[in-house]
Each structure stands twice: as C-alpha cells, then as structure tokens.
Amino acid sequence: MTEEQNELNELKIAPDQTYKEFYPVSPPFSYVGIQVDDATGKKIYNAIEPTMSTEELNILKSIKDSIILNVGVPLAVLKNEKLMKDYLDQMIKKILKKNLKTVPKESVDKLNYYLIRDFLGYGKIDILFHDPNIEDISCNGTNTPLYIWHRTHESLPTNIIFPTREELNFIVTRLVYKTGNQISIANPILEGTLPEGYRAHITLDEVSKRGDTFTIRKFRTNPFTVVDLIQLGTISPKLAAYTWLLVEHSRSMMVSGAVASGKTSLLNAITMFIKPEMKVVSIEEVRELRLHENWIPLTTRPSYQPGIQEVTLFDLLKSALRQRPDYIIVGEVRGEEAYTLFQSIAVGHGGMCSIHADSEDSVIKRLITRPMDIPMMMLPLMNCLIQVKRVALGDHFGRRVESVTEITEIDKESNEPVLETRFKWNAASDTFEYFKSNNEKSVFGLISRINQIPIETLHNELERREVILKWMVDVGVKNYDDVANIIRNYYHAPDDVYNVARLGFR
C-alpha cells in the first residue's frame, strides 16, 4: 500500500459517524469533526480531507515525482506561494496531457489541494495550521496521536499519527527549514518562529526517545483587543480603564500567570493604550506582540555555530536603553534582564513585562531570588502586578484577571513589600470588585505627586474612560484598528469622544 493510501485510510471517517461539533476549515476540502465516545465521554479531533480514488492517487504520485525530479524549478518560484501554485497547476495539466487523461474538474481541484498542502504547507498537519480554533499542536513521537489545544474543547487527541520515524522526520525537517534555523545531533533542541509567526519547539530523537517531537504555539492573526477581553469577561471596563490611566502616565506593570493563562494576550491588549507618538521597544524570544507604528520589535538570537554570537534578552535590553524609548516591554522576564528592566524604570522609562508565577507572593519570591536578584528596596518600582489565570466557568474554561495589586512601599520594620489590592475577581458572581484608594502611596497618589494632578481628578478620569470602554463594547467596536483609533482620538479630543460615548451614539 502506498504512503498516500496509508494517509488516506488514517483520515477516512466512517459515513455513520456523529459529531458533537462539525465545522469547515478550508471548504470544500477540509473539515473538522469533534467526536465523542458515548461510553467514556472521551473527545477526539477528527481532521477530514477529500478521499482519493486509486487513479487520483496514481496521478498525484506521478506529479509529485515529476516535481521532485525537475531540478529546474526557479528559486523565485519556490519562494513565492502564488507562483508555486501556478506552477503546480501547470504541472497537473502537463501530466494529464502527457498521459492523455481526461480528469473531472473535481479531481483536478483535489489534486491541487494535496499538492499545495504537501509542497507549500505542512503535509498532513496543514489542516491544524488553518484551524483558527487551535492554540497548540503537540507531537510526542511516532505511533501516538498528535494532540491539540482547542479553544472550546481544550486538550484533544487527533486522528493524525506518524507511524514511522521517516515520515515524522520529514515533517520535522519541513518545520526546521521554515524556521530558517538549524538542528543537528550536536544541537538537538530548537526554538524558532515559523513564517506565520507561530512559535515552534522541536527536539530530535537524540533526546526524545519516542522519536522526534514538536510543539507549535499558534497566535491569533488578529490579536485580542481590550474590547475583546471585556466581552470575554477576562477584565472589566473599570479595570481596563485603570490600566489605561497607568499606561498614559508611564507607570510600570507586570502581568503574571501560569502557562496558557493569557498573559501575552492581556499584555498585548494593554499596550493599545500607549500614545501613538511614544517610542516603544519590545523585547521577546519569539515575536508575539503587536504595537503601533513607532515601535521597534527586538527578538533574541540563539547561536548554533562557533563564531556566531548569541543575542540574549539581557543584550537586547541594554541595546533598547540606548534608543531612548518611552516604553520598554519585555515579553517574559526570567533572568538577569529583570534587574536591567527595573533600572530602566528607575530612570523614568515606562515598563511592562510578563512573568510565570501563580500568585503575587510567587512573583515577589521569583524577583528577589536568583537569577533575577532584584533588591527588595527596588520592588516598588514595579507599580502594579496583574495576576491572570485560567478558570472553570461551568462546562467550559476561560481566563480571568484574578487580582490587580499595587506595590506601594517596603515596610521598614519587616522589610517586606506592602501590597494594596486594587481589583479582585469574585468567582461566585464572576464580577470584579474595585477598591478605591486616596492613599498618597498608591499608584494614583504617585501619579498625582509627579504630575500635580489631584487624586480625585484621576478617579473622575477613571469613570470617564470606563464609560468609553463600555460604549465600545455596546456598539460592537472590536476591530483592532478601530479600537486603536478611538483611543488615539481620545488623547487628542477627550471631551468629544467622551460625549459621543456618554450619549451612546453609534
């Protein structure tokens, strides 16, 4: 049996199959069915693609062989998806004409689908790349189902399996090539970015004994806006308005949470509040953030060869400080770069970052111990800690900001940071409680002192911005650019935007 027939059998679904959910991915060719075992309740993610007749499989193999043997394909064609699609279409016509075959248009369309999938895409896992409901793709080796993380159904096994090491190695080689990096027996672990912006982590069977493995972290093409997060219940309008005020006045914030808790999505949404004219430098290992035009995105570079210098987060942060940024954003702090970030905040730069930690106490412990080693007296430089977590919401899961805490000072007697809770999520009612403060050591007190703005004026401004954010939710302003434009307009004509929102105009 040919490889194509084996693959076809793996993807073929029984005609009497019933699904909990069924939706198109790339119609009319690929679909997804979420199957549920009635006995165990176990869910399976079924990737469904067109079935091929024996004749179609033979033609497909013939075309693939011809393309592989044809070493004269111009490099410009190989690098251009549109030109490559045209080239594949011509190859199909050429093979059919050569063999004097008349094939229905439906068959030609299927041949095109599989050729584009296998030569330009990612082979049998290509459907997973195109499904917008998938957040993560995990392959744990040979002869075991690929697992995905579905936005609705969470962790699911799929009906996609790599039965041989050769087949898995072929896909891994494709992934490595698309990252533009190198992997070898000497360096069997790779972190890279795919052309779509997705993060890929790959290990060879030198270190993963079940065979090569890969994990792909997908990111939304259109990132969540602050309005999206309000609608999802991750934050409240008042909480969003609070972060807006802090961003405007160049206060520092740290978003903390466990893996897949929504840290990056929240951090990216908050950055929308940065004034367009402000210069921003972001520093990440893999580029995930999206900001306005006056933005320099920096990413680390690992070294795989002697003579090629590794570029770390610490190196990039030192470089960023020489570029006179108004705001520095570090995708995730985990080492010595944390100390440099705190130093940059101390000299007046706005700063934002994320950190892996499951509570405020864990954040403090991570910051003051190796390898970050932040002196206790410097902790209040990070004005605000935002703790986000993944929570159960009835029969599904979501993300919620569990708390917003201000580090106001260091207690002189205990030498411990003094924390003030500003927002707290109530799990029973799924609402956010706001704790107003006129304390001069609070963040509003700090803004008041530095900018000579009465604290009550800041509280009033908080209410105004809450009205605007509620209005955006009510009228359905969700597009990233539309949300950004309203925020930009508010900076230039605050009364005009507020009055439109207050009166509820659409």
Kindly give the residue locations of the regions a language model identified.
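N-terminal accessory targeting/assembly segments
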Residues: 1-183, 503-506
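Conserved nucleotide-binding/hydrolysis micro-motifs of P-loop NTPases
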Residues: 51-52, 143-144, 152-154, 164, ...
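P-loop NTP-binding catalytic core
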Residues: 139-252
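Switch/coupling sub-region of P-loop NTPases
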Residues: 242-256, 265, 269-391
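Conserved glycine(s) of the Walker
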Residues: 262
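Conserved P-loop NTPase
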Residues: 384-470
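Terminal-proximal interaction/regulatory segments of ATP-powered molecular machines
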Residues: 464-506
